Amino acid sequence: MQNQKIRIRLKAFDYRLIDQSALEIVDTAKRTGAVVRGPVPLPTRIERFDLLRSPHVNKASRDQFEIRTHQRLMDIIDPTDKTVDALMKLDLPAGVDVEIKLQ
């Protein structure tokens, strides 16, 4: 797998989970002899929602909610077969979305 790059993008609502997962991926890749760039924190996506408190009147009275999606980006340069096997066996927390691209 020479001259290839694995790009890993992590998404989660909890920044502690995403940082822990990123650390596990970096440790696993470095143990197998690959070069890792990152984790690079990407901008946090914030979705805001306004809901009326009352079902009938009082339009001025609203509840405000938000969802924050944290993101990290990592590149693994020149991965070996051992690196790919170790990454596939890695067990990450349930709240982390992992997107992997081979380039």
From Swiss-Prot:
Q: Which GO terms describe its molecular function?
A: structural constituent of ribosome; tRNA binding
Its job: Involved in the binding of tRNA to the ribosomes.
Q: Does the keyword Magnesium apply?
A: no
Q: Does the keyword Ribosomal protein apply?
A: yes
- Which species is this UniProt entry from? Aromatoleum aromaticum (strain DSM 19018 / LMG 30748 / EbN1)
- What's a Pfam family in this record? Ribosomal_S10
NCBIfam families in alphabetical order:
PRK00596.1 (NF001861), rpsJ_bact (TIGR01049)
Q: What are the alphabetically sorted keywords of the record? A: Ribonucleoprotein, Ribosomal protein
Q: Which GO terms describe its biological process?
A: translation
CC annotations in GO:
ribonucleoprotein complex; ribosome
Q: How does it assemble?
A: Part of the 30S ribosomal subunit.
Database matches in InterPro entries: Ribosomal_uS10, Ribosomal_uS10_CS, Ribosomal_uS10_dom, Ribosomal_uS10_dom_sf
Give the UniProt family note: Belongs to the universal ribosomal protein uS10 family.
What is the protein name for this chain? Small ribosomal subunit protein uS10
The record's listing under HAMAP family reads:
Ribosomal_uS10
Q: Which SUPFAM superfamilies match?
A: Ribosomal protein S10 (SSF54999)
